[in-house]
Swiss-Prot record:
HAMAP family, per the entry: RNA_methyltr_TrmA
Pfam families: tRNA_U5-meth_tr (PF05958)
EC number: 2.1.1.-, 2.1.1.35
Listed name of the protein: tRNA/tmRNA (uracil-C(5))-methyltransferase
Role noted for this protein: Dual-specificity methyltransferase that catalyzes the formation of 5-methyluridine at position 54 (m5U54) in all tRNAs, and that of position 341 (m5U341) in tmRNA (transfer-mRNA).
Record lineage: Bacteria, Pseudomonadati, Pseudomonadota, Gammaproteobacteria, Enterobacterales
Gene Ontology process terms (BP): tRNA methylation
Keyword Transferase attached: yes
Length: 366
């Protein structure tokens, strides 16, 4: 695979290899055949980052070969959304001959939605001034005149200039209901929107007969919490990143959801609070003992669950675990399988044509 060529003819084979690999990895814990959710074969990534290469008068996006570290010119990127591809051409055309925008520009980050909104961040090794702001505003207006719903952001050391806003609002159809998700530039969002919809619908389906409340650790912008709220009496969710918490609060209001509470704290801190080891000012006014959480949802970073959180989640009758790294999932399952059994297993092809796998397991207490 190269940035400008996707081996779409190999999609089925690469997916079959992942299914076999996941089944083999999970064999010590389950004999279930994974439920498989396919990605679109192209234009599936909603975000992308590129370095910029200044080659005389020419200017173009580049990526680096992971093995050789050599640079690769990228004029089109079929893994990314159609909107990103359109913007790549338009941004180069708008910046190439404009000194204020081009000088010391080293990277562009693109974030797009299925609802055809975009944020493009321009990263610089220089101080950004009023001349830059005026040039960027003119470029933004020119892009909008072409029918592109785009926001531009300038970034430099200790500097961030928003011409109007640093977010876009995604709209996803999830099990017959449109969900609105505010996505903030430079914060985590699901990269493959089509796969995100399938993950949300799978999570809804496996929790459809739930009793009691849901606890979620690492909730981000509320991606799963808000979609799953319809299956539970109440949802209590934790997140540490300020922009994500703010986006989650907006998303609660935008989706008219009244049974979700977001707490800004790390999963490790929350574990201490739940176990009564420490009290936190941030939890004043929240009656943790009043929640009857029979299901816990975790979508941890690639490192998986730490040992204290492993112990904490074992106290819940059901654990819904979305993993972006099956190796650390299996490491966690060495502990979790002592108290729980795997009752559902899914493979989500979030990153086609790469070694990476995303998977989901539902664990029920023995």
């Amino acid at each position: 695979m190269t940035p400008e060529h996707l081996p779409t003819e190999q999609y089925e084979a690469q997916l079959a290899e992942k299914v076999a690999r996941l089944q083999s990895m999970m064999a010590p814990f389950s004999d279930l055949v994974p439920e498989v959710f396919r990605s679109p074969v192209s234009h599936y990534r909603m975000r992308a980052e590129f370095r910029l290469w200044h080659d005389g008068d020419d200017l173009y996006h580049i990526m680096f070969d992971q093995q050789t570290k050599s640079r690769i010119r990228v004029d089109t990127f079929p893994a990314a959304s159609q909107l990103i591809n359109t913007l790549m051409k338009a941004m180069i055309a708008g910046v190439r001959d404009n000194h204020a925008l081009r000088h010391k520009l080293f990277q562009m980050d693109y974030l797009t939605t299925l609802s055809n909104q975009a944020v493009v961040s321009l990263l610089y090794h220089k101080k950004l001034d009023e001349e830059w702001r005026e040039a960027a505003t003119a470029l933004r207006d020119a892009l909008r005149a072409q029918g592109l719903n785009v926001h531009l952001i300038g970034r430099a050391t200790k500097t961030k200039i928003e011409l109007d806003q640093d977010y876009i609002d995604e709209r996803l159809p999830v099990a017959g209901k449109e969900m609105i998700y505010r996505q903030v530039e430079n914060s985590f969002t699901q990269p493959n929107a089509a796969m995100n919809i399938q993950m949300l619908e799978w999570a809804l389906e496996v929790t459809k007969d739930s009793k009691g409340d849901l606890l979620e650790l690492y909730c981000g912008n509320g991606n799963f919490s808000l979609a799953l709220a319809r299956n539970f009496n109440r949802v209590l969710a934790t997140e540490i990143a300020k922009p994500s918490v703010a986006a989650a609060q907006y998303n609660i209001a935008a989706n008219h959801i009244d049974n979700v509470q977001i707490i800004r704290m790390a999963a490790e801190e929350f574990t201490l609070a739940m176990n009564g080891v420490r009290e936190f000012n941030r939890l004043q006014g929240i009656d943790l003992k009043g929640y009857q959480c029979e299901t816990i949802f975790v979508d941890p970073p690639r490192s998986g669950l730490d040992s204290e959180t492993e112990k904490m989640v074992q106290a819940y009758p059901r654990i819904l675990y979305i993993s972006c790294n099956p190796e650390t999932l299996c490491k966690n399952l060495e502990t979790l399988s002592q108290t729980h059994t795997v009752s559902r297993l899914a493979l989500f092809d979030q990153f086609p044509y790469t070694h990476h796998m995303e998977c989901g397991v539902l664990l029920t207490a023995r």
